Swiss-Prot record:
Biological processes, Gene Ontology terms: L-tryptophan biosynthetic process
GO molecular function terms attached to this record: anthranilate synthase activity
A Pfam family: Chorismate_bind
Lineage: Bacteria, Pseudomonadati, Pseudomonadota, Alphaproteobacteria, Rhodospirillales
The protein, known as: Anthranilate synthase
Active site: C610 (nucleophile), H699 (for gatase activity), E701 (for gatase activity)
Length: 732
């Protein structure tokens, strides 16, 4: 949104006077604010005053950094509907600027009409003329008016001054007309941009905030000494509003089937239909914004008071178009999976996403279309994919994202870059025009702002915009969330409908004020260890202290001693349980059998892990074998065959293994019962038929054994049953 070092620069605090390309004289002054509270007055005021706040709540090197910028009571508003753009002075300061704007528009060839009034200028663009595809963005449109305004105020050395606001979906039809089926409401606007003269900028990383104020001199006078202000435009709750969706049950699935038929005909490659969820909302928009920002930080966050009681609250994950110094960037997102219950669950979901052929195809098609968009306005050979299928995590979702760049060719500007991508394939489909016609024919309501963009058009020639998705539109007491899914030929109708609902979930919670819930934690182990003492025999192991920690979580008191000292301590300490740790080498290297004998002589229960199981097998006359390949740090599904240690656990568990030795099934002692095995029959757990002895070959303390809290639950059973003397009863 602005250079990373801007707020730290001493030059910003020095008054600056410059002249724009169109002859407007500008004076800039900046003052320091308390970064802890700088934005709060802006956010609170946006409940009733026109304005906007843009922020980024995430860090992604090379793509995003945390920052924020906001304002209220802008001087000028630019509003478009169809091919007409209205420019309004919102206060006395805006009235100083309006004559200069009118002068800049007089004689503009792209206009069919221009009306001037003291506080308003209305410009109507001419009908488009046929142009080569490379010049499509130069067709007469409301953007012709925007380009003239940008040229009037052009100031290459100021990175903050510009137009801020939102662009609606229907703007694309000025360049790609389609047959419109859906009736557009009378209050729909296609564009709303503000020209602010007071901005608050925050750099949370540097801990800096600045109020940046501008004064203007035009032929009509100076803004110096004129008050900032404007009318109230509050949100009006409606206690009679009802929740709902613009798709009845089964409707979206039928859209998916219709799309699949279009894919088979070759009409479409992909398409992204949406559905809108409505929630009554009595809370202030600022409250919804604060909840959403806290629960779902995103690269493109926005809170916009659009006037007329309409608001946007956004936490968009996707860059639309960013332009700086002639470099054009986009970050198309496609490929979605739900977050896991914890970090291990996330890892499994990331793997699922990255190995999904459908999700890979989704993003590939999006990026190929995106590259084509850039090729229209960029230098030959400059369009490159600089990031491929990168993972981004959000509160409920995991996405894959590409990063694409290009260099604008001579004669092209930021608006050309903006328009060539309208609208992003990630919210429309491909081929774009056919996809947009499909959306018009099958969606149940107009998109309004959804699928468009919001952000900044800079007077320095730059641009930073986010795609308008994961955005709440609030009006007349109702909050609306629209969400879509990318459909391909192999789409499952129910899964695509579920994806829409998943994408909308965090936003519906923010509307309702529903807490997302605390971060998931591992299930607590049974407290069977309360009051019990454990001696943990360390066989030079690298995981022994994690194992001790798990045992302590059962309430037990644990003492860890190296194998060379542990046996002598047995008689002195008389623990309630002896635990034989994993370790390198063979059981004989540590005389594990001797430790077991010493424990049995004292009547102490023994539990073994990995090497401990191998030592137990050898102690009772069994034999070990060497695996064809070591299994170190590998996850394995084991099948539970019974036994007290697995009481209450599922029949199949995923566990972590670190071993190259294994008990020979054909030489297993008759006194030992196998209670768990791998799919190919390898021994994974044993229990003694008469004595309080049990062991597992896998590592219950490994992160690979975290799934469902299996490792902790098993050790809870160890304390509850083995240490308590209940194991032999169960084994018998």
């Amino acid at each position: 949104m602005y250079p990373a070092d801007l707020l730290a620069s001493p030059d910003l605090l020095e008054p600056l006077r410059f002249q724009t390309r169109g002859g407007v004289t500008v004076t800039r002054r900046a003052t320091a604010l308390d970064p802890r509270t700088a934005l709060d007055p802006v956010i609170d005021a946006l409940d009733r005053r026109r304005g906007l706040l843009l922020s980024s709540g995430v860090e992604a090197p090379g793509r995003y950094r945390r920052h924020a910028l906001g304002f209220t009571d802008p001087a000028v508003a630019l509003t478009a509907r169809g091919r007409t753009l209205r420019i309004d002075a919102l206060n006395g300061r805006g009235q100083v600027l309006l004559p200069a704007v009118a002068e800049a528009l007089r004689g503009l060839e792209a206009l069919a009409g221009l009306e001037e009034a003291p506080s308003r200028v209305t410009a109507s663009s001419a009908s488009p003329a046929p142009l080569p595809g490379e010049e499509r963005s130069r067709q007469p449109s409301v953007f012709s008016v925007l380009r003239a305004v940008l040229d009037l105020f052009a100031a290459p050395d100021d990175p903050l001054l510009g137009l801020y606001g939102a662009f609606a979906y229907d703007l694309a039809f000025q360049f790609e007309p389609i047959r419109q089926r859906l009736e557009r409401p009378d209050d729909q606007r296609d564009l709303l941009l503000y020209l602010p003269d007071r901005l608050v900028a925050l750099d949370p990383i540097a801990g800096l905030a600045r109020l940046v104020a501008y004064e203007f001199i035009t032929a009509a006078g100076s803004t110096e000494g004129l008050e900032c202000g404007g009318r109230d435009h509050p949100y009006r709750p409606d206690t009679n509003a009802e929740a709902g969706c613009d798709h009845a049950p089964g409707d979206y699935q039928r859209v998916v089937e219709s799309a699949k038929a279009a894919f088979r005909r070759g009409d479409l490659f992909e398409v992204v239909p949406g559905q809108t969820f409505a929630e009554p909302c009595a809370d202030a928009p600022s409250s919804v914004f604060r909840r959403l920002r806290a629960a779902n930080p995103a690269p493109y966050e926005a809170f916009v008071n659009l006037g007329r009681g309409e608001f946007l609250v956004a936490a968009s994950p996707e860059m639309y178009v960013r332009v700086a110094g002639g470099r054009v960037e986009t970050c198309p997102i496609s490929g979605t999976v739900a977050r896991g219950a914890d970090a291990l669950g996330d890892a499994a979901q990331v793997l699922r996403l990255l190995t999904s052929a459908k999700d890979a195809a989704e993003l590939t098609m999006c990026t190929d279309v995106d590259r084509n968009d850039k090729a229209r306005v960029c230098e030959p050979g400059s369009v490159r994919v600089i990031g491929r299928r990168m993972i981004e995590l959000y509160s409920r979702l995991i996405h894959t994202v590409d990063h694409v760049e290009g260099r604008l060719r001579s004669g092209m500007d930021a608006l050309d870059a903006f328009l060539t991508h309208s609208w992003a394939v990630t919210v429309t489909g491909a081929p774009k025009r056919w996809a947009m016609q499909f959306l018009e024919d099958t969606e149940q309501s107009p998109r309004r702002w959804y699928g468009g963009a919001f952000g900044r058009l800079g007077f320095d020639g730059g641009m930073d915009t986010g795609l308008t998705l994961r955005t709440i539109r609030m009006a007349e007491g109702v909050a609306y969330v629209r969400a879509g899914a990318t459909l391909l030929s192999d789409s499952d109708p129910d899964a695509e409908d579920a994806e829409c609902r998943l994408k909308a979930a965090a936003f519906r919670d923010a509307i309702r004020g529903t807490a997302a819930g605390a971060a998931p934690t591992l299930p607590a182990a049974p407290r069977g260890g309360e009051g019990r003492r454990v001696l943990l025999v360390d066989h030079d192991d690298s995981f022994v202290h994690t194992l001790a920690d798990y045992l302590r979580q059962t309430g037990a008191s644990v003492t860890t001693l190296r194998h060379s000292h542990a046996r002598a301590a047995l008689a002195e300490r008389r623990p309630d349980l002896v635990v034989l740790s994993p370790g390198p080498g063979r059981p004989a290297d540590f005389d594990v059998a001797g430790t077991i004998d010493a424990a049995l002589a004292l009547g102490l229960p023994v539990f073994g892990v990995c090497l401990g199981l191998q030592g137990m097998v050898e102690r009772f006359g069994g034999a070990l074998d060497v695996l064809p390949e070591p299994v170190h740090g590998k996850a394995t599904e084991v099948r539970v065959l019974g036994g007290a240690l697995f009481a209450g656990l599922p029949e199949r568990l995923t566990v972590g293994r670190y071993h190259s030795l294994v008990a020979r099934r054909d030489r297993l002692p008759a006194d030992l019962t196998v209670t768990a095995e791998t799919a190919d029959g390898l021994v994974m757990a044993v229990e003694h038929r008469r004595l309080p002895l049990a062991a597992v070959q896998f590592h219950p303390e490994s992160i690979l054994s975290l799934d469902g809290g299996a490792g902790l639950a098993l050790l809870g059973n160890v304390m509850d049953r083995l240490a308590a003397g209940a194991l032999t009863d169960a084994a018998a």
